[in-house]
Regions:
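Active-site beta-loop-alpha junctions enriched in small/polar residues
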Residues: 24-26, 48-54, 119-121, 148-151, ...
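C-terminal domain-boundary segment and adjacent tail
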Residues: 143, 231-280
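Catalytic domains of cell-wall/extracellular-matrix polysaccharide-remodeling enzymes
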Residues: 92-93, 97-174, 179, 192-197
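A short alpha/beta connector and helix-capping loop motif
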Residues: 3-27
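Acidic (Asp/Glu)-rich catalytic clusters
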Residues: 9-15, 30-44, 61-74, 107-108, ...
Length: 280
């Protein structure tokens, strides 16, 4: 999303505190992470398919160049602030065109795209979730999806969609041989400044440990000054606290001590491609 997020991703990937990340192609700082990823085979980077520009003053437009008639943009020509507005206005064909433009841009920049996931969960909207999966199939890249929408952490923008509504998309992903996650955990952006983090408790909860495949959608960001602190004046500390925690040897020791097997999206992509190649 920004320089601090790019810096944190590269630093923590090399430290071992995280195993994968995803880039927001429409954002102004995308060229930086594209350049870094193209020159660093260690970095496991997907595309964070983006249909919204939710910040007050740090905003972005469609990569495809589509305008008002597409329903993708607000009156100022930016992607909508709210997922609800995107769902109410965007034409599914335009959404797919924009996704493909973002993926094509990432590939052309030299990124070895390991997976596709959804900024603010918007790609999982029932208006176009089938297209989300089909785009992944077309590019031979797995998409992030859970067995139940209620187990997808960033689902607050899809509150009207039930698990029953979502079943057909899960079936579609499974039929395509996609890895389907049991749960997606997300950063707690409501944590007040000064309160201790709870990541250790989150990752060792009994229901989490009982799952086979869990995705952690965290948002570490290196401190500015004057970047993330201005972009997110109310929640910047959550991101910088993640950066500080995940960069410690204590965090690595904690992960090593748990009954967890860390994997990468590149490994899951390889398994997916091997399985689909056998079916051809």
């Amino acid at each position: 999303m920004c320089h601090g997020a790019n810096s944190a991703f590269v630093e923590l990937s090399h430290h071992g505190g995280i195993t994968a990340g995803s880039a927001m192609v429409p954002c102004p700082w995308f060229p930086e992470i594209a350049d870094l990823a193209a020159r660093d085979d260690l970095l496991d980077l997907g595309v964070h398919l983006t249909l919204n520009a939710e910040k007050a003053h740090y905003r972005w437009r469609p990569v495809s160049g589509l305008g008002a008639s597409s329903g993708l943009v607000d009156a100022e020509g930016y992607l909508w602030h709210r997922v609800a507005d995107t769902r109410a206005n965007a034409h599914p064909e335009a959404v797919e065109t924009e996704w493909r433009a973002q993926i094509d841009t990432a590939l052309a920049a030299g990124i070895d795209v390991t997976h596709l996931d959804a900024h603010m969960g918007s790609a999982l909207g029932p208006e176009w979730c089938d297209r989300y999966i089909n785009v992944g199939i077309d590019y031979d890249i797995p998409v992030l999806i859970t067995r139940a929408l209620s187990m997808y952490g960033p689902n607050n923008h899809l509150a009207d969609v039930t698990d029953v509504d979502f079943e057909r998309f899960v079936a579609q992903a499974e039929a395509a041989g996609m890895p389907v996650f049991d749960e997606v955990l997300e950063t707690n952006f409501s944590r007040p400044r000064g309160e201790p983090t709870t990541y250790e408790t989150m990752l060792t909860a009994s229901d989490v440990l009982a799952h086979d495949l869990v995705f952690c959608a965290f948002h570490p960001n290196a401190p500015g000054p004057g970047e993330i602190e201005v972009i997110e004046p109310d929640t910047w500390h959550v991101r910088t606290d993640e950066h500080a925690l995940f960069g410690t040897d204590e965090w690595l020791a904690f992960l090593e001590a748990q009954p967890l097997e860390l994997t990468t999206m590149r490994e899951l992509r390889a398994e997916y491609r091997t399985a689909t190649a056998r079916q051809r």
